[in-house]
UniProtKB/Swiss-Prot annotation:
Chain residue ranges for the region called Calmodulin-binding: 441-460
Compartments, record wording: Membrane
Protein name per its UniProtKB record: MLO-like protein 9
Membrane topology: Multi-pass membrane protein
Entry's free-text remark on domains: The C-terminus contains a calmodulin-binding domain, which binds calmodulin in a calcium-dependent fashion.
Gene name for this UniProt entry: MLO9
Length: 460
């Protein structure tokens, strides 16, 4: 007895023409309302950035909107093309090669009893059954052929795209908040140096270069050995990435090279704007990063453990970048000591690109961009698998290793956002060029007038 028309429990899935109009209208209305609210929130955030003249942050927001639009197009293509994609057949020997999980025989009797204790576990069992039905070969597939991808698998990919969009916004916000929080702590030093500016320029304040706190903190007997030099730089980025003497020395060097002597200048505000300008770069998703996503999914094969190796790239690269940036600061201190000069006030550092890898400061920023993207992608991937397949799925055979990977991801996010990116924003100012784009209008006009006066003096 199949339960014909009486109770609705035995009814199969209804098509749209059999669905009540109020149900369709309600669902559409809720989705439209949520979409409008999200659009208004993004619009209001953009208005705040424009009102506060945060040009770099506004451009970063526009870039995030563009990335979300790309993800939206991907979602639309999946929706409209899912029936056509699911109808593609491939030979069985290819259809069962390089799978995410090994042969799945279903849970044992003991496991089944444990899983039934929670609703979440019941959902896992249901998803297993649903996958087995959805993965059945379609009618139009010939013998020894299987579907390229099932409708249910396409739906799961669709959910993955949604996770990418949500976590991309969340990670971008976290990165910016942590970076700004770090630089905000330097405001006290900036206010102190502004109040003491007259004293700093006092001609009576003469010292030997090796007596300055900046040189003393970076130059010691261990600095002559390359190995111990980089070991010190490695630990310095973790224990105390930027000291007061570092900030004041680089501030003095920047102003001495790029600005007029005695000019009032808020260096901390400039660094904050520079960070926002860098954020505009790291928030985007370049084509090569999409290529990395494809390679990550391609090599996430059961038993290969390639993704476990890839997971180690962000922490290692982050520590290498931080060590290099600390080494640049220490090299500048060594250069000051080698002059054996008597200085007035703060020591002046040499401003040059030669300390950076291949003399390209932007290369470091692109490496930070890659680290942040890969780390965010792996965390997103973990939560998507947890949502779709459960925490103890075949994707997580070695659960202890998964926990370590997640902890590493959280650590890298904090280290890169709170330490490495602000440190880069500071150290990159010691390059040969300065970012005119991050100055506000008033400062830019003052700089232009000063450069014109300097040019006229040189002509005379």
């Amino acid at each position: 007895m199949a339960g014909g028309g009486g109770g609705g429990g035995g009814e199969g899935p209804r098509q749209l023409d059999q669905t009540p109009t109020w149900a369709v209208s309600t669902v559409c209305g809720v989705i439209i309302l949520i979409s409008i609210i999200l659009e208004l929130i993004i619009h209001k955030v953009g208005e705040v950035f424009e009102r506060k003249k945060k040009k770099a942050l506004f451009e970063a927001l526009e870039k995030i909107k563009n990335e979300l639009m790309v993800l939206g197009f991907i979602s639309l293509l999946l929706t409209f093309g899912q029936n056509y994609i699911a109808s593609i057949c491939v030979p069985s020997r290819y259809g069962h090669a390089m799978s995410f999980c090994g042969p799945y025989d279903g849970p044992s009797e003991d496991d089944r009893k444990k899983l039934k204790k929670t609703d979440h576990a019941m959902r896992i069992l249901y998803s297993v059954q649903r996958r087995s039905l959805a993965d059945a070969p379609p009618v139009n597939c010939k013998k020894d052929y299987v579907a390229l991808i099932s409708l249910n698998a396409l739906h799961q990919v669709h959910i993955f795209i949604f996770f990418l969009a949500v976590f991309h916004v969340i990670y971008s916000a976290i990165t910016m908040m942590l970076g700004r929080a770090k630089i905000r702590g330097w405001k006290v030093w900036e206010q102190e140096v502004i109040h003491e500016q007259e004293m700093m320029n006092d001609p009576s304040r003469f010292r030997l270069t090796h007596e300055t706190s900046f040189v003393r903190e970076h130059v010691n007997s261990w600095a002559s050995n390359k190995f111990f030099f980089y070991v010190m730089c490695f630990f310095r980025q973790i224990l105390r990435s930027v000291r007061k003497s570092d900030y004041l020395t680089m501030r003095h060097g920047f102003i001495s090279v790029h600005l007029a002597p005695g000019m009032k200048f808020d260096f901390q505000k400039y660094i904050k704007r520079s960070l926002e300008d860098d954020f505009k770069v790291v928030v985007g998703i370049r084509p090569e990063l999409w290529a990395f996503v494809m390679l990550f999914l391609l090599f996430d094969v059961h038993g290969w453990y390639v993704t476990a190796v890839i997971t180690m790239i962000p922490p290692l690269l982050t520590l290498a970048i931080g060590t290099k940036l600390q080494a640049i600061i220490s090299y500048m201190a060594l250069e000051i000591q080698e002059r054996h000069a008597v200085i007035q006030g703060m020591p002046v550092v040499n401003v040059s690109d030669q300390h950076f890898w291949f003399e390209k400061p932007d290369l470091v920023l692109h490496m930070i961009h890659f680290v942040l993207f890969q780390n965010a992608f792996e965390i997103t991937y973990f939560f998507w698998i947890w949502y779709e397949f459960g925490l103890r799925s075949c994707f997580h055979h070695h659960f202890g290793l998964i926990i370590i990977r997640v902890c590493l991801g959280v650590g890298v996010q904090f280290l890169c956002s709170y330490i490495t990116l602000p440190l880069y924003a500071l150290v990159t100012q010691m390059g040969s060029t300065m970012k005119r784009s991050v100055f506000d209008e008033q400062t830019s006009k003052a700089l232009e007038q000063w450069h014109k006066k300097a040019r006229k003096k040189n002509e005379k």
